[in-house]
Design a protein with these regions (language model features):
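Gly-Asp-aromatic-enriched flexible segments
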Residues: 1-240
Length: 240
């Protein structure tokens, strides 16, 4: 049984959490749970799970590599996490999805993989499928699912990868890139213009400090090379 991991405000990369569960659902029937923290391929079903670094479209990301089951039927590969979301905070699930390359000389192309994000609580008769995309993209495609309705609740968040409507599992190795839950309102990234403005302010303060005129956040330093200046311009959130 998965233990619930209480989340606080911040960015939680699911691939770094210890409470992952791997399973598969064959032909829409009962879920089959594999050994705790399973990694590799399952001989009976053909389903596979592995933590990898996947490069798609020139961008390398830590990812969970999966292949849907295909022996004795077809179905969905499922990676699940039990999470306790804090009350009063917004939350969103974010990830990137893609499938692997194939060798056209030796194997046919995948017709696509169906990526699904599902959430279940103790009150639900069945998991709610909040996101679904059937795709054969070999470059990263973003996923964003609002989890704010589950604030204050314990949930099982499941990432499913299946063969899609044709039930064709050929070359269906797929990736969940950097699956993440973001809790709370996060600072907005600075624009390039704002970064340049802060850089110019810091350089100006450092130059003044180099000649002994120290302002707030500026320092006059001395070493074997002589006297020089340094400066710090903190952001809206302070310094990290």
């Amino acid at each position: 049984e998965l233990l619930a991991l209480p989340l606080s405000k911040g960015v939680w990369k699911l691939g770094e959490l210890p409470n992952r569960r791997c399973s598969y659902i064959m032909d829409g029937k009962t879920e089959v749970v594999l050994a705790h923290d399973f990694s590799g391929g399952d001989r009976q079903s053909g389903v596979s799970f592995q933590a990898v670094t996947a490069t798609r479209g020139g961008t390398a990301l830590p990812a969970v590599s999966v292949h849907p089951p295909y022996r004795g039927g077809t179905g969905e590969a499922v990676v699940s996490y039990r999470l306790q979301l804090p009350a009063g905070e917004p939350a969103v699930f974010q990830a990137q999805t893609a499938i692997r390359d194939h060798d056209p000389k030796t194997e046919p192309a995948s017709d696509g993989v169906e990526f699904v994000v599902a959430v279940a609580t103790a009150d639900d008769a069945a998991p709610a499928r909040l996101f679904s995309r059937f795709s054969d993209s070999k470059v990263w495609e973003p996923v964003a699912v609002d989890l704010s309705a589950y604030a204050g609740k314990e949930i099982v968040l499941s990432l499913l990868a299946g063969p899609g409507p044709a039930r064709n599992t050929t070359c269906d190795s797929a990736f969940w890139g950097v699956p993440t839950v973001v809790v709370g309102v996060q600072p907005q990234p600075l624009s390039e213009e704002a970064w340049r403005e802060r850089e110019e302010q810091a350089i100006a303060l450092a130059r003044q400090a180099a000649v002994g005129k120290r302002g707030a956040g500026a320092f006059t330093l001395r070493g074997e090379a002589g006297q020089y200046g340094a400066a710090i311009i903190p952001g809206d959130e302070g310094m990290v």
